[in-house]
């Protein structure tokens, strides 16, 4: 049983950790950057819109990257709402609108003003035994100034019964408040 699992995982690692796979996959967006914060930002934004076919996701991620220029981190840190005034009605990807994109950039700006990396929000704190708390902490931090914003639909809560539409068997934390 363990040998079968190991063989399967080795096969999948070889399949996915190959330059030919990366070229047709949204993960290619991350491989364009070296700065940790650039990688985090484009990775987070690309993952947020990662539903549908890969070509469509890549095209939409390219659209966001064109708006941000060569450094997503620099753009986030210097972003103002006026940067998007001329693009008001532009759609990004399916239900992820320019309004959502602008909200995400503002939220990321606030996070990076207080943290060197998104990683800081995902580290387990003392007494935590799983990542449910860290994921919910990230979500709460992300929406701390406007929790009713329409963009909250793009970041699931781990404290809700169905925290991820792609997961088949997800259960909430026992006794967690949500």
Where are these regions (language model features)?
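HhH-family (HhH-GPD) DNA N-glycosylase catalytic core used in base-excision repair
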Residues: 1-178
């Amino acid at each position: 049983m363990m040998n079968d699992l190991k063989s399967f995982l080795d096969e999948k690692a070889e399949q996915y950790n190959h330059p030919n796979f990366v070229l047709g996959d949204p993960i290619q967006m991350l491989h364009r950057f070296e700065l940790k914060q650039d990688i985090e930002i484009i990775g987070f934004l690309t993952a947020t819109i990662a539903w549908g076919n890969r070509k469509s996701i890549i095209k939409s991620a390219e659209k966001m990257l064109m708006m941000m220029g060569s450094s997503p981190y620099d753009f986030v840190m210097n972003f103002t709402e006026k940067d998007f005034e001329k693009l008001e009605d532009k759609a990004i990807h399916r239900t992820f609108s320019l309004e959502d994109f602008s909200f995400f950039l503002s939220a990321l700006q606030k996070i990076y003003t207080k943290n060197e990396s998104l990683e800081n929000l995902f580290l387990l704190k003392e007494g935590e035994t799983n990542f449910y708390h860290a994921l919910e902490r990230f979500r709460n931090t992300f929406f701390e100034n406007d929790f009713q914003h329409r963009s909250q639909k793009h970041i699931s809560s781990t404290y809700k019964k169905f925290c991820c539409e792609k997961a088949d068997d997800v259960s909430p934390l026992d006794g967690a408040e949500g």
